[in-house]
UniProtKB/Swiss-Prot annotation:
Localization terms from the record: Cell membrane
Cytoplasm recorded as keyword: no
SUPFAM superfamilies: Cadherin-like
Extracellular compartment residues: 28-699
Identification of the protein by name: Protocadherin 18
Highest taxon, organism lineage: Eukaryota
GO CC list: plasma membrane
Pfam families: Cadherin (PF00028), Cadherin_2 (PF08266)
Species the sequence originates in: Mus musculus (Mouse)
Length: 1134
């Protein structure tokens, strides 16, 4: 039993490979065997393993999928598309599937996907029988009647048992229970069925035993063996004299399968010698005849005619075996038996059958193929068969319809329909194909099958515009949202592949996005305006419209260019731009001597429209009744028609209309007031009549004049702003931190007195201030001047011009006094100015520039931007950013060009006047006592007000008029030498009183205020523009001696003196100034020229000692005054 179960669940997988190669399609037969009644889901085969040799030849074997092409019984087996596993999908019953056929199989086809590399596998699964059925009789009791006179050996056919199994599992034999009178013999019919015949083996005697009951058993040979039984109930009757007899015990008949119903097959004839009822014979089928025979054939009980009651089919049943009996009507009648064998003859009565297997999820008669698929793409599987045999069953298959498809045979009567060309759905979307199958019988029979191939769309066509460029026009002054036009693109693809969406690609028109000008409806391509168009602003708009389809895999697009021309409308009136108009009125001057044809003026007109809308004509509509003037309508030139000398009138009011040629026309009306005036010299008629001579237009003169006035006003505003900024700084709170920085605010003037110490001598050589080395590292490195070196310097620099800069403090300029040195300034004697000062004809006014105790004498470049009225636009002040441009002719440019950049730098040292600041200054601000030094009383010795470079500010001197103060101020120097001062000018200061010193000191004190009044105060605020010199100057400010604070005094006086005495040159050797011819004639210069170039502030005593060694004479006051007058004259000349 266990072996039986094992055999039932055994999967017999024998693959018989039959490969047919045709082009690129491989057909391969695979056969498997399974037993019926296996569990659902049992795996039969794995195609991925069984056809691995074929799959390895494909480009991508791992991506291959399997698709089963179903037939009628296909639901019994299923195929996994990914793995190719064939498994049982439903219960398989061989007896139900194939009945008694010995060969039972399930056939279907499997394709590989994708179809570009199609492989076809034909699968045949043979279903093997298991012994799951027992033989059965149709009747549990079989009655049999036998005459007691029946001879030994008499045969009586018995009912057959039925076993649906086949082979060894089917009915094999019969057996009869043990007895002495009867036996059985097993016989086989022509169809292979087995039946038993009952044989009388011993004479019967009804008087001994009238009936018998025997068991008839039918058995198979299956494992386990199965059997079925029935009871034979035999009755023994009295004997009858004669029984009917057939002419033959058996008959064989040939029956054409196409024989019609009612055909007489056999006329049975049985004879009985008896008479009367005993001689009348009745014909009938034997009791054990199968129901199928009774349904197919019919026998006439009286005549014995066997006829066809139902059509037979050779393909279903090839033969029939019929048992017929004849029995008389007498009592105890014994029937006679006859066997009739009917063989069905095959004829060509079956047309070929065509089955088309399409890979269609829906309709059975429609196959779908994607356009663009390569040649030999799978379309359908065709299977043809003919139930006839021989030539009647041989079939010829053909494909009709279109040359784009072909029929390719794979095995037996199976075919493939493949594409024979690349298909294009846009050219043809559907094909009707016809399969014709014809057998070789006579006459030949054929079948026809139609099906449809529909081409699936792919997104292989981009949207296409009718034109690559569209040009449209629209009038200006349109309303926003106005419809412009529609651009349409067509896409022959289907569905989303053909759904077109329109967009405008991003571009810019006059700096604005195109989407602010026009928009497009994405569904239909309608273009609308988004704004009011102005032809004068933009006359043409060009943009690109993109049409894109909605393909899912990829989207295709195409572009077209749209040119939108904006048509001009006459919406602008002519505008007169010349001559200059005021309230549409212009004044025209005409010389008295103007002859006929004199060009009075030309009206210049501008019309922003274009074309005819911009064309205009001019005409005089009134004021010219006497035809004194003529006007060219095209050029709008006005000429005199008569001589002005002959016209008594001196003024005309001409009304002129300028009208364009638009529709409707627009015009402008102006009034020209023409006035006649006399020239000092009459204009010649030739010059008047010459139209070609260019004359300066009045309007151009006005424009130039306005420009010049604006420029002058701008300069005045800049100067005014500079002065205001400086005065505003005076109101700010003072801060010691700021005072220590590079820029110091101008404090309030502490004193109105004039100090002779306001004159400071600053020696220069060749127009260049002494420059300290940038790389001085220690005080010891400071150069010193030896007398021996001075002599060599004097000979080497014989052509150098040593100038003395006299810096005069501007503390004492009176409020009502202002003097600027120009070329037009008349000569002013110093003695006159001194006399005015002493006589009190003017009063000094306060100056906010401070005195020598409160000023640092330098203005830092980094603070000069505070006075600037310009902004770089970058948020920060930059080098060179000031109110004066380097290219302009300003005093600061001349000063820079002459080498005085160092005068405007500061060293950041705290002046002595600021040492009174306390910690409260940092918190509460500074008071006047903080920044105002104690003022000295007027001293006869100028040294008390003298600033010597390199020296610290002296302490507050006591007010005295004796010359002892001069001696007190003069302290020994570090070298042990006596301090030299300006009074000595090369000589030692005497210890006794000197009237000459007193007069000289008084004179210098008064000259201080004179120079302050002679020079412009605004020049004191100029700053450098060279950022590089700033850092250089800061390096040079470091003093060589400990505890000393020095710096170069600077100011406008230094600039004036420099301008007078120097003639600087540029790097190219070209003089920078305009006074190169002025040669200084001062008696000071021979002595000052001996000062070396490397002069330092701390070497001032050495200079004086050197000068004293030269034994220079001291000039008196009158000479000094004359020299100063000479200085003033040279300054004015330069």
């Amino acid at each position: 039993m266990h072996q039986m179960n094992t055999k039932m669940h055994f999967r017999f997988a024998l693959a018989l490979l039959m490969a047919f190669f045709s082009h690129d399609v491989l057909a391969k037969n695979l056969k498997y065997r399974i037993y019926e009644e296996q569990r659902v889901g049992s795996v039969i085969a794995r195609l991925s393993e069984d056809v691995a040799d074929v799959l390895l030849k494909l480009p991508n074997p791992s991506a291959v999928r399997f698709r089963a092409m179903p037939r009628g019984n296909s639901p019994l087996l299923v195929v996994n598309e990914n793995t190719g596993e064939i498994s049982i999908g439903a219960k398989i019953d061989r007896e139900q599937l194939c009945q008694k056929n010995l060969n039972c199989s399930i056939e279907f086809d499997v394709l590989t996907l994708p179809t570009e590399h199609l492989q076809l596998f034909h699968i045949e699964v043979d279903v093997l029988d298991i012994n799951d059925n027992s033989p059965q009789f149709s009747r549990p009791v079989i009655p049999i009647e036998i005459s007691e006179s029946a001879a030994v050996g008499t045969r009586i056919p018995l009912d057959s048992a039925f076993d649906p199994d086949v082979g060894e599992n089917s009915l094999h034999t019969y057996s009869l229970s043990a007895n002495d009178y009867f036996n059985i013999e097993v016989r086989t019919r022509t169809d292979g069925a087995k039946y038993a015949e009952l044989i009388v083996v011993k004479e019967l005697d009804r008087e001994l035993k009238a009936s018998y009951e025997l068991q008839l058993t039918a058995s198979d040979m299956g494992v386990p063996q199965r059997s079925g039984s029935s009871i034979l109930k035999i009755s023994i009757s009295d004997s009858n004299d004669n029984s009917p007899a057939f002419e033959q015990p058996s008959y064989t008949i040939q029956l054409l399968e196409n024989s019609p119903v009612g055909t007489l097959l056999l006329d049975l004839n049985a004879t009985d010698p008896d008479e009367g009822a005993n001689g009348r014979i009745v014909y009938s089928f034997s009791s054990h005849v199968s129901p199928k025979i009774i349904e197919t054939f019919k026998i006439d009980s009286e005549k014995g005619h066997l006829t066809l009651f139902k059509p037979v089919d050779y393909e279903i049943t090839k033969s029939y075996e019929i048992d017929v009996q004849a029995q008389d009507l007498g009592p105890n009648s014994i029937p006679a038996h006859c066997k009739i064998i009917i063989k069905v003859v095959d004829v060509n009565d079956n047309k070929p059958e065509i089955s088309i297997n399409l890979m269609s999820p829906g309709k059975e008669e429609v196959s779908y193929v994607f356009e663009g698929d390569p040649i030999d793409t799978f379309v359908a599987i065709v299977r043809v068969q003919d139930k006839d045999s021989g030539l009647n069953g041989e079939i010829i298959c053909k494909l009709h319809g279109h040359g784009h498809f072909k029929l390719q045979k794979t095995y037996e009567n199976n075919y493939l329909i493949l594409t024979n060309a690349t298909l294009d759905r846009e050219k043809r979307s559907e094909y009707s194909l016809t399969v014709i199958a014809e057998d070789k019988g006579t006459p030949s029979l054929s079948s026809v099958r139609h099906f449809t191939v529909q081409i699936n769309d792919i997104n292989d066509n981009p949207p296409r515009f009718q034109r690559s460029r569209y040009e449209f026009v629209i009038s200006e002054n349109n309303s926003p949202g106005a419809y412009i036009t529609t651009v349409t693109a067509t896409d022959p693809d289907l569905g989303e592949n053909g759904h077109v969406t329109y967009t405008i690609l991003e571009s810019f028109v006059l700096g604005s996005s195109i989407t602010t000008y026009v928009t497009i409806d994405p569904s239909n391509g309608a273009i609308y305006a988004l704004r009011i168009f102005d032809h004068e602003e933009v006359s043409q708009i060009t943009f690109v419209v993109e049409a894109r389809d909605g393909g899912s895999q990829k989207q295709l697009s195409s572009n077209t260019t749209v040119v939108l021309t904006i048509i001009d409308e006459n919406d602008n009136v002519p505008v007169v731009i010349g001559p200059a108009m005021h309230n549409n009125t212009a004044e025209i001057s005409i010389p008295k001597g103007a002859e006929s044809g004199f060009h009075v003026t030309r009206i210049r007109v501008v019309d922003r429209d274009s074309g005819a809308n911009a064309e205009f004509s001019c005409s005089i509509v009134s004021g010219n009744e006497e035809n004194i003037f003529i006007m060219d309508p095209r050029s709008c030139d006005i000429h005199t028609n008569v001589s002005m000398e002959s016209i008594p009138s001196a003024e005309w009011a001409l009304s002129v209309i300028i009208q364009d040629k638009g529709s409707p026309p627009l015009h402008t009306k102006v009034l020209l007031r023409c006035m006649v005036f006399d020239y000092a010299e009459s204009v010649t008629s030739t010059a008047m009549t010459s139209v070609s001579r260019a004359s300066l237009d009045v309007s151009m003169i006005i424009i130039i004049s306005l420009g010049a006035i604006c420029a002058v006003l701008l300069v005045i505003m800049v100067l005014f702003a500079t002065r205001c900024n400086r005065e505003k700084k005076d109101t700010r709170s003072y801060n010691c931190r700021v005072a220590e920085s590079t820029y110091q605010h101008h404090p309030k003037r502490p004193s109105r007195q004039i100090h002779k110490g306001d004159i400071t001598l600053v020696p220069t050589i060749n127009g260049t201030l002494p420059i300290r080395s940038h790389h001085r590292s220690s005080p010891s490195s400071s150069p010193t001047l030896e007398r021996g070196q001075m002599g060599s310097r004097q000979s080497h620099n014989s052509h150098q011009s040593l100038n003395s800069l006299v810096t005069i403090s501007s503390n004492h300029v009176p409020e009502n006094f202002s003097l600027e040195l120009t070329h037009a300034t008349p000569a002013v004697e110093v003695s006159q100015l001194l006399s005015m000062l002493h006589q009190g004809q003017y009063q000094p006014r306060p100056s906010f520039r401070g005195n020598k105790y409160s000023r640092s004498y330098r203005y830092a470049l980094q603070d000069m931007d505070k006075f600037s009225l310009k902004d770089s636009g970058r948020g920060d002040s930059e080098a060179g950013d000031s109110d004066y441009d380097l290219g302009r002719d300003s005093p600061i440019d001349r000063l820079l060009g002459e080498g005085f950049s160092d005068l405007f730098l500061t060293d950041g040292r705290i002046p002595a006047a600021m040492r009174l600041c306390t910690e409260e200054c940092r918190v509460l601000g500074h008071s006047d006592q903080c920044w105002m030094p104690p003022l000295p009383s007027p001293s006869s010795d100028y040294r008390s007000n003298m600033f010597i470079p390199g020296e610290e500010f002296p302490a507050q001197p006591q007010q005295q008029h004796s010359h002892q103060g001069l001696d007190d101020d003069s302290q020994p120097a570090e070298n042990g030498e006596k301090k030299k001062s300006f009074s000595t000018f090369g000589k030692d200061s005497p210890s006794d009183e000197d009237s000459g010193d007193s007069s000289t000191s008084s004179l210098l004190s008064e000259m201080s205020s004179v120079f302050q009044r002679l020079l412009p105060a605004s020049l004191d605020t100029f700053s450098e523009c060279n950022e590089g010199d700033r850092s250089n100057s800061l390096e040079r400010r470091k003093g060589p001696a400990q505890g000393k604070t020095g710096g170069y005094p600077q100011g406008v006086a230094a600039w004036a003196a420099s301008t007078h005495f120097q003639n600087p040159t540029s790097s190219s050797g070209t003089p920078l100034g305009t006074h190169s011819s002025v040669q200084p004639s001062s008696k000071w210069l021979p002595a000052m020229e001996e000062i070396p170039e490397n002069y330092e502030e701390d070497d001032f005593d050495n200079v004086l000692n050197h000068l004293s060694d030269g034994k220079h004479e001291l000039m008196d006051a009158s000479e000094l005054v004359a020299e100063i007058n000479k200085l003033l004259q040279d300054v004015r000349q330069s």
